[in-house]
């Protein structure tokens, strides 16, 4: 689903390839690798790569952190609402937005399982392959139990 909106899953393989155009130098290593893998999937489907958006990444990071610390797993934050509300509150003037979320326990490297899981879920796959999305940001949080919580947000302006 996506907003004009999007929503979705706890899932969890795709090859991690060299950096693609549009990578933000401020992304962390896992987020960077997810970004690269998602753009590789888009390239394989003859879609343009997504561009990194630092403000969207901040919103995604905040959502992952809140899910990990407040122990909920949802596109709807009990305090800050859905991705549309969270992006707007951060000053992101989106025209179209979407979100994929992922949570995993016990995996040393969540990149492959996150991307594979998203691609095997119709709603997540739709977000990744929506031609209208032009920008993305990804945020990851580690739980005290070692779990990974990942949020990828998409937008078009």
Residue ranges of each PLM-predicted region?
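N-terminal secretory signal peptides that target proteins for export/translocation
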Residues: 1-6
């Amino acid at each position: 689903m996506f907003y004009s909106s999007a929503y979705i899953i706890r899932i969890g393989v795709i090859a991690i390839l060299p950096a693609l155009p549009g990578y933000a130098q401020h992304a962390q290593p896992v987020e960077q690798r997810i970004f690269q893998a998602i753009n590789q999937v888009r390239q394989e489907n003859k879609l343009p790569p997504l561009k990194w958006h630092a403000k969207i990444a901040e919103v995604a990071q905040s959502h992952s952190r809140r899910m990990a610390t407040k122990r909920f797993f949802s596109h709807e934050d009990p305090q800050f609402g859905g991705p549309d509300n969270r992006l707007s509150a951060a000053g992101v003037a989106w025209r179209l937005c979407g979100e994929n979320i992922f949570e995993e326990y016990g995996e040393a490297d969540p990149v492959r399982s996150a991307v594979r899981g998203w691609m095997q879920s119709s709603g997540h796959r739709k977000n990744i392959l929506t031609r209208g999305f032009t920008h993305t940001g990804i945020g990851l949080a580690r739980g005290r139990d070692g779990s990974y919580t990942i949020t990828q947000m998409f937008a078009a302006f």
